[in-house]
From Swiss-Prot:
Organism expressing this protein natively: Lactobacillus delbrueckii subsp. bulgaricus (strain ATCC 11842 / DSM 20081 / BCRC 10696 / JCM 1002 / NBRC 13953 / NCIMB 11778 / NCTC 12712 / WDCM 00102 / Lb 14)
Protein name: UPF0397 protein Ldb1710
Cellular-component GO terms for this entry: plasma membrane
Keyword tRNA-binding assigned: no
Family matches, as Pfam families: ECF-ribofla_trS
Length: 186
């Protein structure tokens, strides 16, 4: 377990700030409408998964939450707090799995990829259905059919985005790291 992932070190604070800015940029320019109101195919969640796996749950939550708040304010002039917290907790839950993987040491095996994808699909379902949908029903008096349709489509689209693009990004990242014990002194 990498205990540094829980700390707000200068490196993690920089990752939080830069990650939030990148979240806004990618969310603004790489968002594809789905046809369902306020529900888009968001490539930014592959980036969030990568950040959460590299820096852990604290930075994962911060980038998801802050990035989503800033993106909402920029795009709509207001924010939906339950969906912002949902994005933050998606980063947090994926970041929790990062504590069990040595991705910084070049390790991301097929088994770890499968577990990562199970974790992210479950996390997507939890955050978008519970925080997103139930939050909209309680806070905004939105009809259940509408918000559960949005949550279902969001879970599917974000899960697929992370499964494909997020897994590729993480495998490339792990491949760029020096494996533990691979360097030998002659």
């Amino acid at each position: 377990m990498n205990k540094d992932m829980w700390k707000l070190s200068p490196k993690n604070i920089a990752a939080l700030g830069i990650g939030s800015a990148v979240f806004v940029i990618v969310g603004r320019f790489a968002s594809i409408p789905s046809g369902l109101p306020n529900t888009n195919f968001e490539l930014v969640y592959a980036f969030l998964a990568m950040i959460a796996m590299i820096y852990g749950p604290t930075v994962g939550f911060g980038v998801g939450f802050i990035g989503h708040v800033l993106l909402d304010l920029m795009m709509y002039g207001q924010t939906w707090w339950n969906w912002n917290f949902a994005a933050g907790f998606l980063g947090f839950f994926i970041g929790l799995y990062a504590l069990r993987v040595n991705i910084d040491q070049g390790e991301f095996s097929a088994k770890e990829m499968v577990i990562f994808n199970v974790v992210q699909v479950v996390a997507n379902a939890i955050v978008w259905f519970l925080l997103g949908s139930v939050g909209d029903m309680v806070l905004n008096s939105e009809p259940a059919a509408k918000v559960f349709a949005q949550a279902g489509l969001t879970t599917l689209m974000d899960g697929l985005t992370i499964a494909v693009l997020g897994t590729i990004l993480l495998k490339l990242y792990a491949g760029s790291r020096v494996k533990k014990g691979s360097l030998h002194k002659d």
